[in-house]
Structures are given as structure tokens and as C-alpha cells.
Curated annotation (Swiss-Prot):
The keyword Transmembrane helix does not apply. GO terms for cellular component: chromosome. InterPro entries: Meiotic_Rec114 (IPR004354). It is found in: Chromosome. Its main location: nucleus. One of its GO terms (biological process) is reciprocal meiotic recombination. Keywords: Chromosome, Meiosis. This is Meiotic recombination protein REC114. It comes from the Eukaryota. Belongs to the REC114 family. Required for meiotic recombination events; not required for mitosis. Pfam families: Meiotic_rec114.
Length: 431
């Protein structure tokens, strides 16, 4: 094995997704995507080698740290036009080749970036000597897109004003302008073209009308952005300009009074309300002057005050309606809860109520011996009734518990009442 050429590489790039190519290079393929490239250039030593084997084959290798093979291609010498192709533009060499390792034909790509022009020329000459196809990268697409972009930019700048002969020299120079490295980002090329335009177009006469000049921000050449394509052509750059969202306009809607209030009020009541509102305004106005003889009023801005008072009356009426509705709802809820509690309490305290009623009836049936005794008995009865009412109102509703059931079972009057109820129910069922 003979080492024909060996060069240190500055950067190695590989396309991660191989493309199916059943017809080889003549098959229809999708253009490579920029996001699918992997790069290797930092904290490592990369080397590209061209080796000649004794069997008459050529081996192309990309070696990492003198140990691992990133690329290892073996081809027959002289008859390799249908299996591998190279395209170059200093200092980059791109390679695409057909591989059949896993069955179907697959197209793979990789690129190497060299540190200087001498190494670049060495590899190109050695590949051509070994009868490899080495093409120069086409720059027509990048140049045409660049000229179109710069012409659109100059047309938008011109507007309605005239240019001098410097613009003509700029057009001629734009055709002849070429960059050394065509793999660099299109935005950098565009930035250099704009700088030339500003230097050449120095004598431009502006009209009287003030044209709005927009300021464009271009990326700095220090940005590490790279674009790859099949023939080392730079794709057209597209710039998206974010649009600021419009501020939202929020309008507050005034609450209109309900229709029920309008239907309830009669025309006479409306007139009375208006009269009261006007009289209130007249009293509150400091500049009001009353003449007793003619009964005339000299008040400034009286219609404006009337409108404001009517609005206030409507708003207050609507607020009162809302508050009355809220209070009525709360009262209904409270009454419902009270009724439920009273039903439960009535079931538990029927015996107590019967006992209290019997005691009150006995006290009412006491004969009166005289006027003083009668008054005293009446006062005591009234006081006892008041105290009983207070107790019933203060006592919280009792809950059915084991303790309460035990107390009721010990109560003789309650048990007698239960026995009476059982007798009555048994008689009703017998009938």
C-alpha cells in the first residue's frame, strides 16, 4: 500500500441522512437540508489520505486522531465515474458517492475544509491524476440571487429620485464581483455588496419630498453560519420581519336599566322624577339666581346637568333593583333553611310543645280572687309567655343523638304520649 497524498483537514462535515439512488447519479434526489449536516472541527486532529493498494484499487480515508475512520472508501482505479464525484471551490472540497453496503444503492455526502490554498491544490491535483471527476462549484445560482436581491434593494432605495453615473459603475462592478469563498453565508456577501453600493453611490440627489428611510440590520461576518448544497451553491436567504401586534382597544359598556322598571313607572311618575332631579340640580348649583317677579332662572349649562342627573337616577335605580334582587334571594334561602330546621325541631319537640300548652291552659284557667290578684296573674302569664318565646327563639335546633333518645325514653310524659299515638294508630288500622 502506497500513501499517494496526505493532508491535515481544518473541518469535516457529513450529511447524516443518505438518499436512495436506484439509478445512481442520474436518479432524482431531493436537495440536502442544512439542518442535517454534522460538523467536526474542535479539539481533534483530522487527516485526509489517498492510498494506492497493490490490487489496483484506491482508498480514500478521513481519519480522526490517527485511530478512527470517519470515511473509508475503496474504488477501482480508472473506472469510478459512476460511483464517486468531487466538486471544489477553494478551500472546500465536496464529495458524493454511491454505497451498496446495506443492499440498495444509497448516495452519501461529505465535505472537507482545508486550512490553506496549497493543501487544497495538492488534493485537487492528486484526484485529477487518479482520473477522478473533479468539478468546480457553480456560482450562477448564488450570483443571480445576489444580483436580484441587490437590484431590488437599489430600486426600493431609488423611489422617485435620480442617480448619477456612479450607479452605472456599481452595476458593472456587481457582475464582476466574486468572493473567494462561495460557501460563506449569503448574508455576508449581501452585506459587502451593500457596502460597495454606499461607497459608489455618493452623489445622489434627493427630491423635496421626505422619503421614509428604513434601517436594515445585517448579521456580522463573525456569525458562525454555514449553508451546504449539492454543488456548493448557497441558497437564497429569506428574512422574516416580525410585525408588532396592534394594541387592543377595550370599551366599557354602560349597564342599561331593566325593562321591568320602565314598564312599572307611569308617565306621571317620570315627570315627577324629572322635576325632582331638576330641582336638585338647581339647589346644588351655586350660580343659580331666582327672580321672584318673573320666576325666571339664569343657570349655566342646565341641559348638561339634566342629562347627568337622569343618568345618575337610572344608574341608582338599576343598582337598587340589583340589591333588592340579591337581598330577596338571600331571604328566600334563609327562609328555606329555617323552615327545614323548624320541621325537624317540630318532629322532635312535639311532646314539649304539648306539655307547655297544657301548662299555659291550666294557668289561664286559674280563678281570679280580686283585681290585684288578677293583674298579678296576668302579668306573670305575660312574662312567662315572653320568656318561653325568647327561649324558643334562642335555643338552637337539636340534633337527634343517642343521648337525646335516652332522655326521651326516661321522660314519662313523652312515653305516655307515644303510647296514646300507638293506640290511635292501631284503632285506625283495625277500622
Amino acid at each position: 500500500m502506497y500513501e499517494y497524498c496526505s493532508v491535515i483537514i481544518k473541518k469535516y462535515s457529513r450529511y447524516t441522512i443518505p438518499s436512495l439512488a436506484p439509478k445512481g447519479f442520474s436518479s432524482v434526489l431531493e436537495p440536502p437540508h442544512i439542518d442535517k449536516w454534522q460538523h467536526l472541527s474542535v479539539n481533534c486532529t483530522l487527516q485526509f489520505k489517498v492510498l494506492l493498494e497493490d490490487s489496483g484499487q484506491v482508498a480514500l480515508q478521513v481519519i480522526l486522531n490517527n485511530s478512527t475512520f470517519l470515511e473509508h472508501i475503496r474504488l477501482p482505479l480508472g473506472s469510478n465515474h459512476d460511483s464517486i464525484q468531487f466538486s471544489c471551490k477553494c478551500p472546500i472540497i465536496s464529495c458524493k458517492y454511491i454505497s451498496e453496503e446495506f443492499g440498495p444503492k444509497v448516495l452519501k455526502r461529505f465535505q472537507i475544509n482545508l486550512s490553506n490554498e496549497m493543501d487544497f491544490n495538492r488534493i485537487v491535483i492528486s484526484l485529477k491524476n487518479l482520473s477522478f471527476i473533479v468539478k468546480t462549484a457553480k456560482t450562477s445560482i448564488a450570483r443571480n440571487t445576489m444580483i436580484n436581491q441587490t437590484s431590488d434593494f437599489s430600486n426600493s432605495k431609488k423611489g422617485n429620485f435620480n442617480e448619477n453615473n456612479n450607479a452605472g459603475t456599481y452595476r458593472n462592478s456587481s457582475v464582476q464581483f466574486q468572493t473567494q469563498n462561495m460557501v460563506m453565508d449569503f448574508s455576508q456577501i449581501y452585506q459587502e455588496k451593500c457596502a460597495r453600493e454606499l461607497n459608489n453611490c455618493s452623489n445622489i440627489t434627493f427630491p423635496m419630498t421626505n422619503l421614509p428611510m428604513t434601517q436594515q440590520n445585517f448579521p456580522t461576518p463573525e456569525a458562525n453560519v454555514e449553508h451546504f448544497s449539492q454543488d456548493l451553491n448557497t441558497p437564497s436567504a429569506t428574512q422574516t420581519i416580525p410585525i408588532a401586534p396592534e394594541p387592543l382597544s377595550v370599551k366599557l359598556l354602560e349597564a342599561s336599566p331593566p325593562l321591568s322598571n320602565k314598564s312599572r313607572h307611569s308617565p306621571t311618575t317620570k315627570k315627577e322624577n324629572r322635576n325632582t332631579a331638576i330641582s336638585f340640580d338647581l339647589l346644588s348649583k351655586k350660580g343659580a339666581i331666582l327672580h321672584n317677579g318673573n320666576d325666571t332662572l339664569n343657570v349655566a349649562d342646565l341641559p348638561k346637568k339634566r342629562q347627568s342627573t337622569e343618568d345618575l337616577v337610572q344608574i341608582r335605580s338599576s343598582a337598587n333593583v340589583v340589591t333588592t334582587l340579591g337581598t330577596s334571594c338571600n331571604l328566600v334561602k334563609k327562609n328555606a333553611t329555617k323552615q327545614n330546621k323548624e320541621k325537624v325541631d317540630n318532629k322532635l319537640s312535639d311532646s314539649q310543645n304539648v306539655a307547655h300548652t297544657n301548662e299555659y291552659q291550666k294557668k289561664k284557667e286559674i280563678p281570679l280572687c280580686g283585681p290585684i290578684n288578677g293583674l298579678e296573674t296576668k302579668m306573670t302569664l305575660i312574662q312567662e309567655e315572653m320568656m318561653a318565646a325568647k327561649k324558643t327563639s334562642r335555643d338552637p335546633p337539636r340534633k337527634i343523638s343517642k343521648r337525646l333518645i335516652k332522655e326521651k325514653l326516661k321522660d314519662e310524659e313523652f312515653m305516655k304520649w307515644v303510647n296514646k299515638v300507638e293506640r290511635v294508630l292501631s284503632k285506625m288500622f283495625e277500622k
